[in-house]
A protein has these predicted regions:
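Catalytic phosphate/metal-binding cores of nucleic-acid and nucleotide-processing enzymes, i.e., regions
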Residues: 1-105
């Protein structure tokens, strides 16, 4: 699956790193990436191009939720069981970080 489309690039360019500081769970989610065969969800809220790559920032869950940085190339290089790779959620209608979290979080 293509992790980066022209539409996503356009969103990234409008939301550079630190553009949603202080919004916390009210930050807009630009794209959701996920592991299709296990834990791993990345709610990307900000991004900046670095050479041929993108530095991403968002609310991520592997063992617990935490804010953090990663490179798009890191996600793209992950090789999962059965030949699977990290995928982009193309069906979600949720817009903010809070919309992806349990009610009591």
């Amino acid at each position: 699956m293509t992790l980066l489309t022209k539409q996503i690039i356009s969103k990234f360019e409008k939301h550079p790193i630190h553009s949603q500081d202080e919004k916390g769970r009210d930050a807009e989610v630009l794209v959701k990436y996920f592991n299709p065969c296990g834990t791993g969800t990345w709610l990307i809220t900000e991004a900046e191009r670095e050479g041929d790559d993108w530095r991403l920032f968002g609310y991520c869950h592997i063992h617990e939720w935490e804010w953090g940085y990663l490179m798009l190339s890191e996600l793209a290089s992950l090789r999962l069981p059965f030949g699977l790779t990290i995928e982009r959620d193309i069906y979600t209608a949720r817009k903010y970080v809070r919309d992806f979290l349990p009610q009591d979080a």
